[in-house]
Amino acid sequence: MTQKTRTRFAPSPTGFIHLGNIRSALYPWAFARSTGGDFILRIEDTDLDRSTQAAVDVIIESMSWLGLDYDEGPFYQMQRMDRYKTVLAELQAAGHVYPCYMSVAELDALRDAQMAAKEKPRYDGTWRPAPGKTLPPIPEGVKPVLRFKNPLGGSVVWDDKVKGRIEISNDELDDLVIARPDGTPTYNFCVVVDDLDMAITHVIRGDDHVNNTPRQINIFKALGQEPPVYAHLPTVLNEQGEKMSKRNGAKPVTQYRDEGYLPDAMVNYLARLGWSHGDDEIFSRAQFLQWFNLDHLGRSAAQFDEAKLRWVNAQHLKIMSDDALAPLVQAQLQKRGIQADERLPRICALFKDRCDTTVVLADWAAAFYADITLNPAEVSQHVTDAIKPALNLLSEKLASCSWDKLSIAAAIKEVLVACAIKMPLLAMPVRVLVMGSAHTPSLDAVLELCEREKVLTRLRSE
Protein backbone atom coordinates (compact mmCIF):
# COMPACT_ATOMS: atom_id res chain seq x y z
CA MET A 1 0.00 0.00 0.00
CA THR A 2 1.37 3.40 -1.00
CA GLN A 3 2.08 5.70 1.93
CA LYS A 4 -0.10 8.81 2.02
CA THR A 5 1.78 12.01 1.23
CA ARG A 6 2.18 14.32 4.21
CA THR A 7 3.94 17.66 3.85
CA ARG A 8 4.37 20.60 6.15
CA PHE A 9 5.07 24.32 6.33
CA ALA A 10 7.01 25.22 9.46
CA PRO A 11 7.60 28.98 9.72
CA SER A 12 9.14 30.81 12.66
CA PRO A 13 6.83 33.61 13.88
CA THR A 14 9.54 36.23 14.25
CA GLY A 15 8.21 38.89 11.88
CA PHE A 16 6.07 39.35 8.80
CA ILE A 17 6.00 36.69 6.08
CA HIS A 18 7.22 37.69 2.59
CA LEU A 19 6.96 36.08 -0.84
CA GLY A 20 10.13 34.03 -0.42
CA ASN A 21 8.69 32.54 2.77
CA ILE A 22 5.24 31.85 1.38
CA ARG A 23 6.65 30.06 -1.67
CA SER A 24 7.99 27.51 0.84
CA ALA A 25 4.36 26.95 1.82
CA LEU A 26 3.00 26.91 -1.73
CA TYR A 27 4.99 23.96 -3.04
CA PRO A 28 4.37 21.52 -0.14
CA TRP A 29 0.70 22.57 -0.20
CA ALA A 30 0.51 21.92 -3.94
CA PHE A 31 2.30 18.58 -3.63
CA ALA A 32 -0.08 17.43 -0.90
CA ARG A 33 -3.14 18.57 -2.84
CA SER A 34 -1.96 17.09 -6.14
CA THR A 35 -1.28 13.68 -4.56
CA GLY A 36 -4.34 13.48 -2.32
CA GLY A 37 -2.20 13.94 0.77
CA ASP A 38 -2.25 16.11 3.88
CA PHE A 39 -0.67 19.52 4.45
CA ILE A 40 0.31 20.39 8.02
CA LEU A 41 1.02 23.82 9.52
CA ARG A 42 3.62 23.83 12.28
CA ILE A 43 4.75 26.95 14.12
CA GLU A 44 8.40 26.78 15.19
CA ASP A 45 8.21 29.21 18.08
CA THR A 46 11.12 28.14 20.29
CA ASP A 47 12.84 31.52 19.85
CA LEU A 48 11.02 33.05 22.81
CA ASP A 49 12.74 36.42 22.49
CA ARG A 50 11.51 37.00 18.92
CA SER A 51 8.38 34.88 18.46
CA THR A 52 5.04 36.69 18.73
CA GLN A 53 1.39 35.75 18.42
CA ALA A 54 0.93 38.72 16.08
CA ALA A 55 3.40 37.11 13.67
CA VAL A 56 1.51 33.80 13.90
CA ASP A 57 -1.71 35.63 13.07
CA VAL A 58 -0.11 37.22 9.99
CA ILE A 59 1.18 33.83 8.80
CA ILE A 60 -2.30 32.33 9.05
CA GLU A 61 -3.91 35.40 7.48
CA SER A 62 -1.46 35.31 4.55
CA MET A 63 -2.05 31.60 3.94
CA SER A 64 -5.81 32.06 4.17
CA TRP A 65 -5.77 34.91 1.64
CA LEU A 66 -3.78 32.80 -0.83
CA GLY A 67 -6.03 29.79 -0.28
CA LEU A 68 -3.25 27.61 1.17
CA ASP A 69 -5.51 25.61 3.44
CA TYR A 70 -4.02 23.09 5.86
CA ASP A 71 -5.45 19.79 7.06
CA GLU A 72 -3.84 19.74 10.50
CA GLY A 73 -2.50 22.39 12.85
CA PRO A 74 -1.33 24.84 13.62
CA PHE A 75 0.93 22.89 15.97
CA TYR A 76 3.20 24.90 18.25
CA GLN A 77 6.61 23.59 19.27
CA MET A 78 6.44 25.33 22.64
CA GLN A 79 3.40 23.19 23.45
CA ARG A 80 5.35 20.00 22.72
CA MET A 81 8.23 20.40 25.17
CA ASP A 82 7.24 17.36 27.23
CA ARG A 83 7.31 15.20 24.11
CA TYR A 84 10.76 16.47 23.12
CA LYS A 85 12.14 15.76 26.58
CA THR A 86 10.74 12.23 26.48
CA VAL A 87 12.49 11.49 23.18
CA LEU A 88 15.64 13.20 24.44
CA ALA A 89 15.67 10.86 27.43
CA GLU A 90 15.30 7.88 25.08
CA LEU A 91 18.29 9.02 23.04
CA GLN A 92 20.30 9.59 26.19
CA ALA A 93 19.44 6.14 27.53
CA ALA A 94 20.54 4.61 24.23
CA GLY A 95 23.93 6.32 24.49
CA HIS A 96 23.43 8.81 21.65
CA VAL A 97 23.62 11.90 23.85
CA TYR A 98 26.19 13.16 26.37
CA PRO A 99 26.60 16.20 28.62
CA CYS A 100 29.16 18.83 27.66
CA TYR A 101 30.45 21.28 30.27
CA MET A 102 32.58 23.38 27.96
CA SER A 103 32.07 27.08 28.70
CA VAL A 104 31.40 29.77 26.12
CA ALA A 105 34.88 31.17 26.77
CA GLU A 106 36.44 27.77 26.13
CA LEU A 107 34.44 27.33 22.93
CA ASP A 108 35.49 30.80 21.75
CA ALA A 109 39.16 30.03 22.47
CA LEU A 110 38.85 26.74 20.57
CA ARG A 111 37.27 28.49 17.60
CA ASP A 112 39.97 31.19 17.56
CA ALA A 113 42.73 28.58 17.63
CA GLN A 114 41.15 26.60 14.80
CA MET A 115 40.71 29.68 12.65
CA ALA A 116 44.31 30.74 13.34
CA ALA A 117 45.36 27.29 12.11
CA LYS A 118 43.07 27.76 9.08
CA GLU A 119 40.87 24.88 10.19
CA LYS A 120 37.09 24.71 10.00
CA PRO A 121 35.66 25.82 13.39
CA ARG A 122 33.97 22.86 15.06
CA TYR A 123 33.50 21.30 18.47
CA ASP A 124 36.46 19.00 19.20
CA GLY A 125 34.68 16.35 21.26
CA THR A 126 36.35 17.23 24.57
CA TRP A 127 33.43 15.86 26.58
CA ARG A 128 32.48 13.03 24.25
CA PRO A 129 32.87 9.73 26.12
CA ALA A 130 34.84 6.94 24.51
CA PRO A 131 36.35 3.65 25.73
CA GLY A 132 39.58 4.32 27.62
CA LYS A 133 39.13 8.10 27.47
CA THR A 134 39.42 10.16 30.65
CA LEU A 135 37.01 13.09 30.67
CA PRO A 136 37.88 16.42 32.32
CA PRO A 137 36.65 16.94 35.90
CA ILE A 138 33.09 18.25 36.03
CA PRO A 139 33.18 21.93 37.00
CA GLU A 140 31.12 22.93 40.01
CA GLY A 141 27.90 24.89 39.52
CA VAL A 142 27.90 24.48 35.73
CA LYS A 143 24.83 23.13 33.94
CA PRO A 144 25.84 21.21 30.81
CA VAL A 145 24.40 21.30 27.34
CA LEU A 146 23.50 17.96 25.81
CA ARG A 147 25.27 17.03 22.58
CA PHE A 148 24.27 14.44 20.02
CA LYS A 149 26.93 11.83 19.24
CA ASN A 150 27.34 12.29 15.53
CA PRO A 151 28.57 9.09 13.85
CA LEU A 152 32.34 8.86 13.38
CA GLY A 153 33.36 8.15 9.81
CA GLY A 154 31.16 7.43 6.83
CA SER A 155 28.85 9.84 5.06
CA VAL A 156 25.29 11.07 5.05
CA VAL A 157 23.73 10.60 1.61
CA TRP A 158 20.31 11.56 0.34
CA ASP A 159 18.62 11.94 -3.03
CA ASP A 160 17.36 15.51 -2.97
CA LYS A 161 14.35 15.97 -5.26
CA VAL A 162 15.71 19.32 -6.43
CA LYS A 163 19.48 19.18 -6.05
CA GLY A 164 20.05 15.51 -6.81
CA ARG A 165 22.38 13.24 -4.85
CA ILE A 166 24.05 14.97 -1.91
CA GLU A 167 26.78 13.37 0.19
CA ILE A 168 28.22 14.95 3.34
CA SER A 169 31.10 13.34 5.22
CA ASN A 170 30.42 12.82 8.92
CA ASP A 171 33.89 14.22 9.52
CA GLU A 172 32.42 17.59 8.48
CA LEU A 173 29.78 17.42 11.21
CA ASP A 174 30.57 18.02 14.86
CA ASP A 175 28.48 16.92 17.83
CA LEU A 176 25.39 19.09 17.70
CA VAL A 177 23.95 20.71 20.84
CA ILE A 178 20.42 19.31 21.09
CA ALA A 179 19.50 20.66 24.54
CA ARG A 180 20.47 23.91 26.23
CA PRO A 181 21.66 24.13 29.88
CA ASP A 182 18.06 24.75 31.01
CA GLY A 183 16.96 21.54 29.26
CA THR A 184 15.21 23.28 26.35
CA PRO A 185 15.73 21.26 23.16
CA THR A 186 17.19 22.96 20.10
CA TYR A 187 15.85 23.44 16.59
CA ASN A 188 17.32 20.47 14.72
CA PHE A 189 16.22 18.00 17.37
CA CYS A 190 12.68 19.40 17.64
CA VAL A 191 12.25 19.29 13.86
CA VAL A 192 13.12 15.59 13.74
CA VAL A 193 10.69 14.70 16.54
CA ASP A 194 7.96 16.77 14.89
CA ASP A 195 8.48 15.22 11.46
CA LEU A 196 8.37 11.75 13.02
CA ASP A 197 5.29 12.35 15.14
CA MET A 198 3.46 14.06 12.27
CA ALA A 199 4.46 11.28 9.83
CA ILE A 200 5.90 13.78 7.35
CA THR A 201 6.83 12.00 4.11
CA HIS A 202 8.26 14.94 2.16
CA VAL A 203 10.13 17.97 3.50
CA ILE A 204 9.99 20.73 0.88
CA ARG A 205 11.85 23.79 2.13
CA GLY A 206 14.39 26.46 1.24
CA ASP A 207 17.96 25.51 0.44
CA ASP A 208 19.17 27.50 3.44
CA HIS A 209 18.28 24.30 5.34
CA VAL A 210 20.59 22.02 3.34
CA ASN A 211 23.27 22.20 6.04
CA ASN A 212 20.72 21.10 8.66
CA THR A 213 19.65 18.04 6.68
CA PRO A 214 22.62 15.69 7.36
CA ARG A 215 22.40 16.46 11.07
CA GLN A 216 18.67 15.73 11.07
CA ILE A 217 19.13 12.51 9.09
CA ASN A 218 21.65 11.26 11.66
CA ILE A 219 19.17 11.96 14.47
CA PHE A 220 16.46 10.07 12.55
CA LYS A 221 18.78 7.07 12.24
CA ALA A 222 19.75 7.23 15.92
CA LEU A 223 16.04 6.95 16.68
CA GLY A 224 15.82 3.93 14.39
CA GLN A 225 13.65 5.76 11.85
CA GLU A 226 13.93 6.51 8.14
CA PRO A 227 14.07 10.22 7.24
CA PRO A 228 11.52 11.79 4.88
CA VAL A 229 12.20 12.69 1.27
CA TYR A 230 13.87 16.10 0.99
CA ALA A 231 13.47 18.78 -1.67
CA HIS A 232 15.47 21.96 -1.10
CA LEU A 233 14.15 24.92 -3.06
CA PRO A 234 16.50 27.47 -4.62
CA THR A 235 16.64 30.95 -3.18
CA VAL A 236 14.23 33.70 -4.23
CA LEU A 237 16.15 36.85 -5.14
CA ASN A 238 14.82 40.39 -5.04
CA GLU A 239 14.96 42.71 -8.04
CA GLN A 240 18.49 43.76 -7.08
CA GLY A 241 19.69 40.15 -7.20
CA GLU A 242 19.97 39.81 -3.42
CA LYS A 243 18.33 37.11 -1.33
CA MET A 244 14.78 38.23 -0.60
CA SER A 245 14.52 39.20 3.04
CA LYS A 246 12.91 41.73 5.35
CA ARG A 247 16.25 43.51 5.63
CA ASN A 248 16.45 43.86 1.85
CA GLY A 249 13.07 45.50 1.47
CA ALA A 250 10.76 42.52 0.95
CA LYS A 251 7.10 43.39 1.47
CA PRO A 252 4.66 41.43 3.64
CA VAL A 253 2.40 39.07 1.70
CA THR A 254 -0.64 40.92 3.03
CA GLN A 255 0.61 44.15 1.45
CA TYR A 256 0.08 42.62 -1.99
CA ARG A 257 -3.54 41.98 -1.03
CA ASP A 258 -3.88 45.62 0.01
CA GLU A 259 -2.28 46.75 -3.25
CA GLY A 260 -4.94 44.96 -5.27
CA TYR A 261 -3.38 41.68 -6.31
CA LEU A 262 -5.56 38.60 -6.75
CA PRO A 263 -4.87 35.39 -4.77
CA ASP A 264 -4.97 33.21 -7.89
CA ALA A 265 -2.58 35.55 -9.68
CA MET A 266 -0.19 35.43 -6.73
CA VAL A 267 -0.31 31.62 -6.72
CA ASN A 268 0.27 31.61 -10.49
CA TYR A 269 3.27 33.95 -10.22
CA LEU A 270 4.80 32.28 -7.16
CA ALA A 271 4.42 28.85 -8.75
CA ARG A 272 6.58 30.04 -11.64
CA LEU A 273 9.32 31.22 -9.24
CA GLY A 274 11.12 27.90 -9.36
CA TRP A 275 8.72 25.57 -11.18
CA SER A 276 7.42 25.41 -14.73
CA HIS A 277 5.05 23.53 -16.98
CA GLY A 278 6.43 23.99 -20.46
CA ASP A 279 5.85 27.53 -21.71
CA ASP A 280 2.57 28.00 -19.83
CA GLU A 281 2.66 31.35 -18.04
CA ILE A 282 -0.99 31.92 -17.12
CA PHE A 283 -2.90 29.10 -15.49
CA SER A 284 -5.62 28.51 -12.95
CA ARG A 285 -5.15 27.08 -9.49
CA ALA A 286 -6.78 23.83 -10.67
CA GLN A 287 -4.37 23.56 -13.60
CA PHE A 288 -1.40 24.19 -11.29
CA LEU A 289 -2.45 21.37 -8.98
CA GLN A 290 -3.07 19.06 -11.94
CA TRP A 291 0.38 19.74 -13.39
CA PHE A 292 2.51 20.10 -10.26
CA ASN A 293 5.21 17.59 -9.42
CA LEU A 294 8.62 17.75 -7.80
CA ASP A 295 10.43 16.76 -11.01
CA HIS A 296 9.83 20.17 -12.58
CA LEU A 297 11.28 22.21 -9.71
CA GLY A 298 14.21 24.30 -10.90
CA ARG A 299 17.70 24.27 -9.42
CA SER A 300 18.60 27.90 -10.11
CA ALA A 301 17.72 30.88 -7.96
CA ALA A 302 14.54 32.65 -9.08
CA GLN A 303 14.42 36.44 -9.30
CA PHE A 304 11.32 38.37 -8.30
CA ASP A 305 10.03 40.84 -10.89
CA GLU A 306 7.16 43.06 -9.77
CA ALA A 307 6.43 44.22 -13.32
CA LYS A 308 5.91 40.59 -14.32
CA LEU A 309 3.72 40.04 -11.26
CA ARG A 310 1.54 43.01 -12.30
CA TRP A 311 1.28 41.57 -15.82
CA VAL A 312 0.21 38.18 -14.45
CA ASN A 313 -2.31 39.93 -12.21
CA ALA A 314 -3.71 41.85 -15.19
CA GLN A 315 -4.27 38.59 -17.07
CA HIS A 316 -6.16 37.11 -14.13
CA LEU A 317 -8.26 40.28 -13.81
CA LYS A 318 -9.34 39.86 -17.42
CA ILE A 319 -10.48 36.26 -17.00
CA MET A 320 -12.06 36.63 -13.55
CA SER A 321 -15.86 36.77 -13.51
CA ASP A 322 -17.29 40.22 -12.90
CA ASP A 323 -19.47 38.99 -10.05
CA ALA A 324 -16.40 37.54 -8.30
CA LEU A 325 -14.33 40.63 -8.99
CA ALA A 326 -16.87 43.17 -7.75
CA PRO A 327 -16.53 42.37 -3.99
CA LEU A 328 -12.75 42.78 -4.23
CA VAL A 329 -13.18 46.18 -5.87
CA GLN A 330 -15.83 47.07 -3.29
CA ALA A 331 -13.30 46.31 -0.54
CA GLN A 332 -10.92 48.82 -2.13
CA LEU A 333 -13.71 51.39 -2.45
CA GLN A 334 -14.71 50.97 1.19
CA LYS A 335 -11.20 52.03 2.22
CA ARG A 336 -12.07 55.35 0.56
CA GLY A 337 -15.43 55.59 2.25
CA ILE A 338 -17.31 54.72 -0.96
CA GLN A 339 -20.24 52.31 -1.07
CA ALA A 340 -20.93 50.82 -4.50
CA ASP A 341 -24.22 49.44 -5.80
CA GLU A 342 -25.52 46.86 -8.25
CA ARG A 343 -23.74 48.60 -11.14
CA LEU A 344 -20.32 47.54 -9.90
CA PRO A 345 -20.07 44.18 -11.76
CA ARG A 346 -20.88 45.97 -15.03
CA ILE A 347 -18.32 48.66 -14.23
CA CYS A 348 -15.76 45.92 -13.64
CA ALA A 349 -16.64 44.33 -16.98
CA LEU A 350 -16.18 47.65 -18.77
CA PHE A 351 -12.86 48.68 -17.24
CA LYS A 352 -10.99 45.55 -16.12
CA ASP A 353 -9.17 45.03 -19.42
CA ARG A 354 -7.27 48.28 -18.87
CA CYS A 355 -6.32 47.55 -15.22
CA ASP A 356 -3.59 45.51 -13.57
CA THR A 357 -4.79 45.61 -9.94
CA THR A 358 -8.10 46.00 -8.14
CA VAL A 359 -6.78 49.33 -6.82
CA VAL A 360 -6.56 50.68 -10.38
CA LEU A 361 -9.99 49.24 -11.14
CA ALA A 362 -11.32 50.92 -8.00
CA ASP A 363 -9.85 54.22 -9.24
CA TRP A 364 -12.10 53.96 -12.29
CA ALA A 365 -15.11 52.73 -10.33
CA ALA A 366 -14.80 55.58 -7.84
CA ALA A 367 -15.68 58.05 -10.58
CA PHE A 368 -19.20 56.56 -10.73
CA TYR A 369 -19.84 57.06 -7.02
CA ALA A 370 -17.77 60.00 -5.78
CA ASP A 371 -16.58 63.41 -6.92
CA ILE A 372 -13.73 63.43 -9.41
CA THR A 373 -10.70 65.68 -9.66
CA LEU A 374 -10.27 67.19 -13.09
CA ASN A 375 -6.87 67.26 -14.76
CA PRO A 376 -6.25 70.95 -15.61
CA ALA A 377 -3.98 70.06 -18.54
CA GLU A 378 -6.59 67.77 -20.10
CA VAL A 379 -9.37 70.30 -19.49
CA SER A 380 -7.30 73.03 -21.15
CA GLN A 381 -6.49 70.77 -24.10
CA HIS A 382 -9.91 69.32 -24.79
CA VAL A 383 -12.60 71.56 -23.25
CA THR A 384 -12.15 74.53 -25.56
CA ASP A 385 -14.48 77.45 -26.15
CA ALA A 386 -15.12 76.08 -29.64
CA ILE A 387 -16.53 72.80 -28.31
CA LYS A 388 -18.68 74.24 -25.52
CA PRO A 389 -21.78 74.80 -27.73
CA ALA A 390 -21.67 71.10 -28.66
CA LEU A 391 -21.34 70.16 -24.97
CA ASN A 392 -24.34 72.32 -24.11
CA LEU A 393 -26.40 70.71 -26.88
CA LEU A 394 -25.37 67.25 -25.70
CA SER A 395 -26.46 68.13 -22.17
CA GLU A 396 -29.89 69.12 -23.47
CA LYS A 397 -30.33 65.89 -25.42
CA LEU A 398 -29.06 63.69 -22.57
CA ALA A 399 -31.46 65.42 -20.19
CA SER A 400 -34.47 64.22 -22.19
CA CYS A 401 -33.47 60.93 -23.83
CA SER A 402 -34.05 57.45 -22.44
CA TRP A 403 -31.10 56.38 -20.26
CA ASP A 404 -29.81 53.37 -22.14
CA LYS A 405 -26.81 52.77 -24.37
CA LEU A 406 -28.67 52.99 -27.70
CA SER A 407 -30.49 56.22 -26.80
CA ILE A 408 -27.28 57.82 -25.49
CA ALA A 409 -25.44 56.81 -28.68
CA ALA A 410 -28.25 58.33 -30.75
CA ALA A 411 -28.07 61.60 -28.77
CA ILE A 412 -24.31 61.80 -29.33
CA LYS A 413 -24.77 61.18 -33.06
CA GLU A 414 -27.40 63.94 -33.30
CA VAL A 415 -24.95 66.42 -31.74
CA LEU A 416 -22.16 65.37 -34.12
CA VAL A 417 -24.46 65.95 -37.11
CA ALA A 418 -25.89 69.22 -35.80
CA CYS A 419 -22.45 70.67 -35.01
CA ALA A 420 -20.68 69.10 -38.01
CA ILE A 421 -17.85 67.70 -35.91
CA LYS A 422 -16.07 64.35 -35.68
CA MET A 423 -16.52 61.97 -32.76
CA PRO A 424 -13.07 62.49 -31.14
CA LEU A 425 -13.62 66.24 -30.90
CA LEU A 426 -16.74 65.66 -28.78
CA ALA A 427 -15.84 62.43 -27.01
CA MET A 428 -12.55 63.61 -25.52
CA PRO A 429 -13.96 66.59 -23.57
CA VAL A 430 -16.96 64.51 -22.44
CA ARG A 431 -14.61 61.84 -21.09
CA VAL A 432 -12.46 64.45 -19.34
CA LEU A 433 -15.45 66.13 -17.68
CA VAL A 434 -17.42 62.99 -16.78
CA MET A 435 -14.62 60.54 -15.87
CA GLY A 436 -11.63 62.77 -15.22
CA SER A 437 -9.64 61.12 -18.03
CA ALA A 438 -9.48 61.52 -21.80
CA HIS A 439 -9.07 57.76 -22.22
CA THR A 440 -12.00 55.53 -21.33
CA PRO A 441 -13.91 52.64 -22.89
CA SER A 442 -16.83 53.25 -25.26
CA LEU A 443 -18.41 56.60 -24.38
CA ASP A 444 -22.04 55.49 -24.61
CA ALA A 445 -21.32 52.50 -22.33
CA VAL A 446 -19.58 54.72 -19.77
CA LEU A 447 -22.37 57.30 -19.73
CA GLU A 448 -25.05 54.62 -19.42
CA LEU A 449 -23.44 53.32 -16.21
CA CYS A 450 -23.11 56.82 -14.79
CA GLU A 451 -26.21 58.39 -13.24
CA ARG A 452 -27.92 60.90 -15.53
CA GLU A 453 -27.77 63.76 -13.02
CA LYS A 454 -24.09 63.12 -12.35
CA VAL A 455 -23.33 63.24 -16.08
CA LEU A 456 -25.29 66.46 -16.59
CA THR A 457 -23.72 68.14 -13.56
CA ARG A 458 -20.22 67.28 -14.74
CA LEU A 459 -20.86 68.36 -18.33
CA ARG A 460 -22.12 71.73 -17.11
CA SER A 461 -19.19 72.25 -14.74
CA GLU A 462 -17.12 74.04 -17.37
UniProtKB/Swiss-Prot annotation:
<feature type="short sequence motif" description="'KMSKS' region">
    <location>
        <begin position="243"/>
        <end position="247"/>
    </location>
</feature>
<dbReference type="GO" id="GO:0005524">
    <property type="term" value="F:ATP binding"/>
</dbReference>
<dbReference type="GO" id="GO:0000049">
    <property type="term" value="F:tRNA binding"/>
</dbReference>
<feature type="short sequence motif" description="'HIGH' region">
    <location>
        <begin position="11"/>
        <end position="21"/>
    </location>
</feature>
<dbReference type="GO" id="GO:0008270">
    <property type="term" value="F:zinc ion binding"/>
</dbReference>
<keyword id="KW-0436">Ligase</keyword>
<dbReference type="InterPro" id="IPR045462">
    <property type="entry name" value="aa-tRNA-synth_I_cd-bd"/>
</dbReference>
<dbReference type="InterPro" id="IPR020751">
    <property type="entry name" value="aa-tRNA-synth_I_codon-bd_sub2"/>
</dbReference>
<dbReference type="InterPro" id="IPR020058">
    <property type="entry name" value="Glu/Gln-tRNA-synth_Ib_cat-dom"/>
</dbReference>
<dbReference type="InterPro" id="IPR004527">
    <property type="entry name" value="Glu-tRNA-ligase_bac/mito"/>
</dbReference>
<keyword id="KW-0648">Protein biosynthesis</keyword>
<comment type="function">
    <text>Catalyzes the attachment of glutamate to tRNA(Glu) in a two-step reaction: glutamate is first activated by ATP to form Glu-AMP and then transferred to the acceptor end of tRNA(Glu).</text>
</comment>
<dbReference type="GO" id="GO:0004818">
    <property type="term" value="F:glutamate-tRNA ligase activity"/>
</dbReference>
<dbReference type="Pfam" id="PF00749">
    <property type="entry name" value="tRNA-synt_1c"/>
</dbReference>
<dbReference type="Pfam" id="PF19269">
    <property type="entry name" value="Anticodon_2"/>
</dbReference>
<protein>
    <recommendedName>
        <fullName>Glutamate--tRNA ligase</fullName>
        <ecNumber>6.1.1.17</ecNumber>
    </recommendedName>
</protein>
<dbReference type="InterPro" id="IPR049940">
    <property type="entry name" value="GluQ/Sye"/>
</dbReference>
<dbReference type="InterPro" id="IPR014729">
    <property type="entry name" value="Rossmann-like_a/b/a_fold"/>
</dbReference>
<dbReference type="InterPro" id="IPR000924">
    <property type="entry name" value="Glu/Gln-tRNA-synth"/>
</dbReference>
<dbReference type="InterPro" id="IPR033910">
    <property type="entry name" value="GluRS_core"/>
</dbReference>
<keyword id="KW-0963">Cytoplasm</keyword>
<dbReference type="InterPro" id="IPR008925">
    <property type="entry name" value="aa_tRNA-synth_I_cd-bd_sf"/>
</dbReference>
<comment type="subunit">
    <text>Monomer.</text>
</comment>
<feature type="binding site">
    <location>
        <position position="246"/>
    </location>
    <ligand>
        <name>ATP</name>
    </ligand>
</feature>
<dbReference type="GO" id="GO:0005829">
    <property type="term" value="C:cytosol"/>
</dbReference>
<comment type="similarity">
    <text>Belongs to the class-I aminoacyl-tRNA synthetase family. Glutamate--tRNA ligase type 1 subfamily.</text>
</comment>
<keyword id="KW-0030">Aminoacyl-tRNA synthetase</keyword>
<keyword id="KW-0067">ATP-binding</keyword>
<dbReference type="GO" id="GO:0006424">
    <property type="term" value="P:glutamyl-tRNA aminoacylation"/>
</dbReference>
<keyword id="KW-0547">Nucleotide-binding</keyword>
<dbReference type="InterPro" id="IPR001412">
    <property type="entry name" value="aa-tRNA-synth_I_CS"/>
</dbReference>
